[in-house]
């Protein structure tokens, strides 16, 4: 189907690089699209105004092409409409803090255990590339655990962090940046602060 859309000029080849759709619980007839992926000649930086502006413009153009594509090529989408577009592009990886412990891919694949684990997960190492056909999805061998020390600053006593900015290597962060893990990190930070106040 994508080849037909490209051939007919409805979408560009880059638009087909990543296409992911989810149903939305409790909202019959509604789908959430987790696309497009912004491809570039260089790695984009979330700290660069020019790169973010490029990603916003390119992303919106791709969204409208994909919208016209699904309406034309997917039965049942003839009356579809876009109800919302994110204000900013999703950034998977940016700056990370240095914590009391830097969590690594080796910790993950060895299922290393810790005295104060904040989450127990099994999401794979999911690396999205700015180049076409170079992304990887590397399954962890076993479940893995993250220590609270990866959420506590090595330099400042009262500084915690939760989410994609945790203290981890690039590969480990690629598995831990998902929403459910981030929720667990936020909860763990609150619990650790309360535990220390007792």
Report the location of each language-model feature.
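Internal hydrophobic alpha-helix adjacent to the cofactor/substrate pocket in enzyme cavities
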Residues: 183-197
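Mobile, glycine/GP-rich and aromatic-enriched active-site lid/loop segments adjacent to catalytic centers
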Residues: 1-161, 166-172
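Short glycine-enriched, charge-decorated loop/helix-capping segments at active-site entrances
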Residues: 175-177
């Amino acid at each position: 189907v994508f080849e037909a859309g490209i051939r007919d000029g409805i979408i560009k080849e880059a638009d087909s690089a990543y296409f992911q759709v989810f149903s939305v619980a409790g909202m019959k007839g509604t789908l959430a699209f987790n696309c497009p992926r912004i491809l570039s000649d260089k790695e984009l930086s979330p700290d660069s105004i020019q790169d973010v502006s490029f990603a916003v413009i390119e992303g919106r153009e791709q969204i409208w092409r994909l919208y016209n594509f699904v309406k034309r090529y997917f039965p049942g989408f003839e009356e579809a409409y876009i109800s919302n577009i994110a204000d900013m592009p999703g950034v998977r990886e940016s700056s990370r803090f240095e914590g009391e412990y830097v969590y690594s891919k080796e910790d993950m694949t060895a299922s290393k255990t810790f005295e104060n684990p904040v989450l127990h997960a099994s999401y794979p190492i999911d690396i999205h590339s700015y180049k076409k056909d170079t992304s990887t999805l590397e399954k962890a061998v076993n479940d893995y655990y993250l220590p609270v020390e990866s959420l506590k600053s090595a330099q400042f006593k009262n500084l915690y962090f939760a989410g994609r900015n945790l203290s981890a290597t690039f590969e480990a962060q690629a598995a831990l940046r998902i929403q459910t893990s981030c929720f667990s990190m936020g909860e763990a930070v609150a619990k650790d602060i309360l535990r220390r106040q007792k």
